[in-house]
């Protein structure tokens, strides 16, 4: 059974079984409410399916025009909650951006969330997929 996709006006999310990637695409204004809904969806997916089949996640911010005030603290809180419920230490996350504003806002979120080394800002889908692949190659060799 395939995981249910997330479809809202400002965000969509789906699991790609071929690449084994969880893909979330944001659009327009990102609010605290949107962030909370995304984390609730991810938490429900993990509760139902676990993390084993998933190689990594790609969060695509390229169509975001505004990160609304309060979203940073919500991201920090939701990330902290999820990391306390589930061991995500072997789950790489690529954060896809298109411009300086998106990069600055995503970088600020990275600075307030745990396990930064498994997260990377990238500028293309190819870069996102390569980061996830390389993460597993490096960690397999180190482990």
Residue ranges and their predicted role:
Residues 2-143:
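Amphipathic, Lys/Arg-enriched alpha-helical "gate/interface" segment within cytosolic domains
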